[in-house]
Structure formats: C-alpha cells, structure tokens
Amino acid sequence: MEYGTSIHREDIGASLLEAKDIELEIEMIFMLTYQIDRDKQVECQTFFTQMTDEQIAGEYPEGVKQIGRWHDMPNGNGVVIVETNDQEALTSFIMSWSGMCTFPIVKPVVDDATARKLMKAMLDSQ
C-alpha cells in the first residue's frame, strides 16, 4: 500500500473494523532539514524575504500542512515540520526548493503522546 491511500476494511481484515464503509486517514508528521546551497545563499534569502502573501499561501501543495519552520540563519539551514499523508505532494514541495537548497533529512516523527503509546506497547510485549 502506498502513502496517501486510505485503508479499507478488506485491506486489514474484517475482524479489525466492524463497519463496512469505514476509512482511516493516516496523517503523518515529517521532519525535514534543509541546507541552502552556499553559492545560492544570498539568492535564496532574498527570495524568501520577498515572498508575497500569495506565494506564502501557495508554498505547500494541497495535502501538505506546515506545522512550523525554524531557521539557523548564519549557517543557511533549518528544520521544517509538516503533516501529510501524500508522499507525492511532499516530494513536490521539496522539489520546489531544489534550485536553491537540499533536504538531506526527511523522516517521519511522532509527538510525545504517540511516542509514549508506542514505547509502552513495545515494553509490554517484551
């Protein structure tokens, strides 16, 4: 099954879902680190500071929601946290900046509550 698809009753077995038409939409949180290309740093910073309201509103494709973005300005890198279930849309966002920077790390992350739940389940199964 690909990212961005719904999980249907027939995909995971009748015993897990009672209702025939239930769909589960899974939203994943990703942490992306970016690094501005040294030779593009001034160009990238100029573009970023001059983005219009329309450009900012349209920066992320449909299906990708920014949670936050933090910048290490002197070193030309930073972190972006997004929520999505659409791998294609996430890749499209990354590619939109590929002329000026790279995203060397893109990985799924979870919040505290989810981490505790998963750790508890892991420890309970040992």
Predicted regions and their residues:
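Conserved short beta-strand edge segments in small beta-sheet-based binding/regulatory domains
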Residues: 101-111
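Short conserved AdoMet
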Residues: 85, 98-99
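Short hydrophobic/aromatic beta-strand micro-patches
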Residues: 81-83
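Short S/T/G/P-rich N-terminal loop/turn motif that feeds into the first structured element of a domain
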Residues: 8, 13-60, 65-76, 85-88, ...
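Short amphipathic alpha-helices in soluble, non-transmembrane regions
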Residues: 92-98
